[in-house]
Amino acid sequence: MWQLLPPAALLLLVSADTQTADPSKAVVLLDPQWNHVLTNDRVTLKCQGDYPVEDNSTKWWHNGTLISSQTPSYFIADVKVQDSGEYKCQTGLSAPSDPVKLEVHVGWLLLQVAQRVVNVGKPIRLKCHSWKKTPVAKVQYFRNGRGKKYSHGNSDFHIPEAKLEHSGSYFCRGIIGSKNESSESVQITVQAPETLQTVSSFFLPWHQITFCLVMGVLFAVDTGLYFSVRRHLQSSEEWRDGKVTWSKGP
């Protein structure tokens, strides 16, 4: 005769099924790390993920279109504006990666930044990048129109520990040949302390909340059925095992 699974066993089965249905995602990495580049730069996109034995074939997508390259690294020797967009990859044993955006700009100077949104206390690194690595002299970095660093050559601007007041609009300027060139402005935002993020992370995403609610309902229903059928089975056994005594009337 069939028996109901205990509630805990049901939850374990559902949880295990949920985990196996979500394989690990691949990850796209940029080399160099900048996702804002100038035309004619070299860009390498690397796909990190699990591969089957002796098979490192990789799928690449650019703006949703499958690329012919099937190598773990996708190399662009002379990047063009049309190479801008979102890139995704997938290995043989991984789910498709989240998209990574690449922006190709036209100009003499480009202010490159590792992250445009930075947590308080984390470093900020800015690079005044020139087209085809043309020599640049008298480089200046500006925030909200005010000069923050000056160097005779081209050096990076590094802020060891970001503070809220470091948020703002940044650009760089320098001399190329006999011309004074400037980059486009880049908005950098320094986030509030981690405590605010900790509070917000206390609340689960909507799909996890839905899963917990469904599991709670299933647990309650299964528990009720489990004990109901158990009482019914016990009553049936007592009826079968009970003895009936007949007596003659007067």
From Swiss-Prot:
InterPro entries: Ig-like_dom (IPR007110), Ig-like_dom_sf (IPR036179), Ig-like_fold (IPR013783), Ig_Fc_receptor (IPR050488), Ig_sub (IPR003599). It holds the Pfam family Ig_2. The record marks 222 as: Important for receptor turnover. It is a single-pass membrane protein. Glycans are attached at residues 56, 63, 180. It is found in: Cell membrane. The keyword Calcium does not apply. Residues 226-250 are cytoplasmic. The chain crosses the membrane at residues 209-225. CDD domains: Ig1_FcgammaR_like, Ig2_FcgammaR_like. One of its GO terms (biological process) is dendritic cell antigen processing and presentation. Disulfide bonds join 47-89, 128-172. Expressed in gamma-delta T cells. Residues 17-208 are extracellular. One of its GO terms (molecular function) is IgG binding. Residues 1-16 form the signal peptide. SUPFAM superfamilies: Immunoglobulin (SSF48726). Keywords: Cell membrane, Disulfide bond, Glycoprotein, IgG-binding protein, Immunoglobulin domain, Membrane, Receptor, Repeat, Signal, Transmembrane, Transmembrane helix. Its main location: membrane. Receptor for the invariable Fc fragment of immunoglobulin gamma (IgG). Optimally activated upon binding of clustered antigen-IgG complexes displayed on cell surfaces, triggers lysis of antibody-coated cells, a process known as antibody-dependent cellular cytotoxicity (ADCC). Does not bind free monomeric IgG, thus avoiding inappropriate effector cell activation in the absence of antigenic trigger. Mediates IgG effector functions on natural killer (NK) cells. This is Low affinity immunoglobulin gamma Fc region receptor III-A.
